[in-house]
UniProtKB/Swiss-Prot annotation:
GO terms for cellular component: extracellular region. The lineage of its organism: Eukaryota, Metazoa, Ecdysozoa, Arthropoda, Chelicerata. It is found in: Secreted. Its main location: secreted. Belongs to the cationic peptide 06 (cytoinsectotoxin) family. It comes from Lachesana tarabaevi (Spider). This is M-zodatoxin-Lt8p.
C-alpha cells in the first residue's frame, strides 16, 4: 500500500469534516466501501472511473487505520504505517469494522439505558 505522508492526516481530516462522520456512520460507511469494492459488475460498468473511486476509498481506509492505530496503541505514525502496510485490504477492513462495531454498539447500549431510565 502506498501512502503520501504530506496529505494523509490533512486529507483524512477533510473527508471526515466534509462528511461529518460519526463513529456509527464511519462503521456503516466503511462497510459499504468494502462491499462496493467487491462488486464485479460495478467495476466492469464504470471502468476507469470505478478504479479511481476504489483507489480513493482504499487510501481513506488505510489512512483511517493508521490514525486509529496511533491513537489506540500509542505508537508512532511511522510504526502504525508499517503495520498497516503489512496488512491485506481484508485485514484492514476487519480491523476498522471491529473497532467501529464495538464503539457504535457501546453507544447504542448507552442510548438504550438512558432512554429506559426516563
Amino acid at each position: 500500500a502506498e501512502s503520501k505522508p504530506a496529505e494523509s492526516e490533512h486529507e483524512l481530516a477533510e473527508v471526515e469534516e466534509e462528511n461529518e462522520l460519526a463513529d456509527l456512520e464511519d462503521a456503516v460507511w466503511l462497510e459499504h466501501l468494502a462491499d462496493l469494492s467487491d462488486l464485479e459488475e460495478a467495476r466492469g460498468f464504470f471502468g476507469n472511473t470505478w478504479k479511481k473511486i476504489k483507489g480513493k476509498a482504499d487510501k481513506i481506509m488505510l489512512k483511517k487505520a493508521v490514525k486509529l492505530m496511533v491513537k489506540k496503541e500509542g505508537i508512532s505514525k511511522e510504526e502504525a504505517q508499517a503495520k498497516v502496510d503489512a496488512m491485506s485490504k481484508k485485514q484492514i477492513r476487519l480491523y476498522l469494522l471491529k473497532y467501529y462495531g464495538k464503539k457504535s454498539s457501546s453507544k447504542s447500549v448507552r442510548k438504550i439505558v438512558i432512554s429506559k431510565s426516563f
